[in-house]
From Swiss-Prot:
It is a single-pass type II membrane protein. One of its GO terms (molecular function) is transmembrane transporter activity. It comes from Helicobacter pylori (strain J99 / ATCC 700824). InterPro entries: ExbD. This is Putative biopolymer transport protein ExbD-like 1. It is found in: Cell inner membrane.
């Protein structure tokens, strides 16, 4: 009788299917119970005033049409004389004031850059270009 072959054929095999089933059930229980766990922290929040509102910053809106005419509020300015005029006008505003530029799409690139350069030379750093959707 050959005992070596007998032991080789009868080796026990590890069945992991029940182990996987148990782990999946534990995972499902963990996923269901985790959102219900809440931690209660006592936080004393400062009280705010209901009447105080955030002040909206002043914005200078500069518009330039296809003929290179520049508009600020209801005033019209010429393209060539705009840097000098804007330097005088900018003294009324704080240099942290936001400046928005709305330029016609038919303008050439250099005219818009000229406008940006003029605004930067006046000391304004918060400049944005407005586009239409």
């Amino acid at each position: 009788m050959n005992y070596d072959n007998y032991w080789d054929e009868d080796k026990p095999e590890l069945n992991i299917t029940p182990l996987v089933d148990v782990m999946l059930v534990l995972l499902a229980i963990l996923m269901v119970t985790t959102p219900t766990l809440t931690y209660k922290e006592e936080i004393a929040l400062p009280s705010g005033s209901k009447t105080a509102r955030a002040t909206q910053d002043k914005v200078i809106e500069i518009r330039m049409d296809k003929d290179a005419k520049i508009y600020i509020d209801s005033q019209t300015y010429e393209y060539n004389s705009f840097p000098d005029t804007f330097n005088l006008l900018s003294k009324k505003y704080d240099k942290d004031t936001r400046v928005s530029i709305r330029a016609d799409k038919r303008l050439t690139y250099d005219k818009v850059i000229y406008l940006l350069k003029t605004i930067k030379e006046a000391g304004f750093l918060k400049v944005s270009l407005i586009t239409s959707p």
